[in-house]
Amino acid sequence: MLSLKKYLTEGLLQFTILLSLIGVRVDVDTYLTSQLPPLREIILGPSSAYTQTQFHNLRNTLDGYGIHPKSIDLDNYFTARRLLNQVRALDRFQVPTTEVNAWLVHRDPEGSVSGSQPSSGLALESSSGLQDVTGPDNGVRESETEQGFSEDLEDLGAVAPPVSGDLTKEDIDLGAGREIFDYSHRQKEQDVDKELRDGAEQEDTWPGEGAEALARNLLVDGETGESFPAQVPGGEDQTALSLEECLRLLEATCPFGENAEFPADISSITEAVPSESEPPGLQNNLLSPLLTGTESPFDLEQQWQDLMSIMEMQAMEVNTSTSEVLYNAPPGDPLSTNYSLAPNTPINQNVSLHQASLGGCSQDFSLFSPEVESLPVASSSTLLPLVPSNSTSLNSTFGSTNLAGLFFPPQLNGTANDTAGPELPDPLGGLLDEAMLDEISLMDLAIEEGFNPVQASQLEEEFDSDSGLSLDSSHSPSSLSSSEGSSSSSSSSSSSSSSSASSSASSSFSEEGAVGYSSDSETLDLEEAEGAVGYQPEYSKFCRMSYQDPSQLSCLPYLEHVGHNHTYNMAPSALDSADLPPPSTLKKGSKEKQADFLDKQMSRDEHRARAMKIPFTNDKIINLPVEEFNELLSKYQLSEAQLSLIRDIRRRGKNKMAAQNCRKRKLDTILNLERDVEDLQRDKARLLREKVEFLRSLRQMKQKVQSLYQEVFGRLRDENGRPYSPSQYALQYAGDGSVLLIPRTLADQQARRQERKPKDRRK
């Protein structure tokens, strides 16, 4: 019988000899060090901390333990297992290991060797390597495409670099990748990926490098490091690839991608107006990159030729097909004559950045051209992106954000293109003359401020910078006073609804100075209202005439009376004098109020003293000392009733003062007691803190004494050198500091005597 150790040892030796014969350097320490944990895990099995398998059994199979390692029948077991595996593999095609590795690297063009025939053990161990080349259920897939490319694939496989010397073909069976053996292989893989990315960029920029990109289209095996051709994708992948490349090329070269205002997509263009001059095959070729076909070519060069033909057809057909599709103008169309829309005008003609940033505004056409207004909406919307941009187009002229282009030529506005050809005639050139600008300014002023046409004509006669727009302006007879302005604005707003609506709309955002004018008529009205005061106005109104709501005038104090009596403006001093009563009435009213207040504050004794006509006040009666009070009484001739009232007032006053003093003393006493209580509480808290500290220090002292007592008692020895028992003896402290050793019974008696002495003293 062959022992297990000898069997395993011979197997390892044979494996090592086999590796050395192949030419691989075998260093067991390198494989078992901690620097390569994947190899260590592959050889020794997974760690026991992460798995429940029997990691000590090096002959562990998929079925677990078949027999005990020290069993006698171990040799028979291995023989039976080997024979059983041979019987099971009779219907399978057995391929040696070397042949399998060669089959992985070099692909058989005739497909005679299938991927579904290796044994079960080999399939389990080398599954990671097989998945990179063929799928688990591929088998032998012979199609017309693979047969057509078999010779090219053989040539590409022959050019593969040689296998590295550090890599053995048995490592593939272990499931270890090449990066485990060679750490520099990762850097090589990064370099290969970088080269592939650079080749893809060059492929996008220049079509002629398709063949070189095809030559670089190789896959590197993750375990062996050898290069083999990539699997040819199916029809769906190729279609997706061509679609992505076509879209990228269309974005880079086709003018439709750059025009943001293109009115319709490609499908709507082809369905709306098909071109009669083009054959149907040409239309299909134009949209071939965007449609998924059933069959797609595999040649990259043919794809690039198709894309180049698409680009050439687009460049030829832009000037003919797109203009006819978007707008087919009849010969006498006013739009083609007025706006110079030639049929051969390209879409991407010189477009400035300023014009491209403006949005379309087709609603402004009706203000200037009745022909454009009569067109349907669909035709005008499709016309907008095709307006020639080297002239002053409607989008840049009447856009909602371009006010400078309305009054300045394109050369001053900076939106014209210098490289453009001769400019086309501007359809709006004769509309913006000087007279029209003046009329527009006056019309805006009349609409915004609520003027009637008569007042607008009067303002037109004296149209200068100082005609009434400044605060202290020259007094012209044509300017309006405050009353005239208010009446005229109200009449104009009630007479025409359009002017009132425009004035209310424009007054919310216009900020163009005052509208009320300080004129001669205002000065005359103020002089008539003031009389001899001679008030000269030094201010001007800052209220707009379009604000007709009286609630909006409440912020100005000198305009509050306008909504009540409808009189002329008056000076603030005149308003104050008109509102206030005469001075005499003010004085009388103040005295009466003061007297009523004093009457309410007076007591009953004061009322009686005033009724009895006593010549001195109650304060003197109450507060004067006795001698001064008697002298005061001797100075006046008083009746008995007056004297009795004075004595009663003095007595009640003295009693009141005494009661007040008593209450004051009581309050002072209460306050003093409160202070004393607070002081006692503070003292109590302080004493409690001191008591706690004393108890803590006393406890510490007792602990120290107890520890010292135990230490001293533990060191005491009798004549024989034995320690004294603490249950029989105790230490006694004398007054002079000496310590005595006495029996425990005597010590207990002395302790009881000391306890009785305090009790006798209490009695």
Curated annotation (Swiss-Prot):
Residues glycosylated per entry: 338, 350, 413
Domain bZIP: 645-708
Residues covered by region (Basic motif): 647-666
Source organism superkingdom: Eukaryota
Motif Nuclear localization signal, residue numbers: 752-759
Locus of motif Destruction motif: 466-470
Official protein name in the record: Endoplasmic reticulum membrane sensor NFE2L1
Gene of this entry: NFE2L1
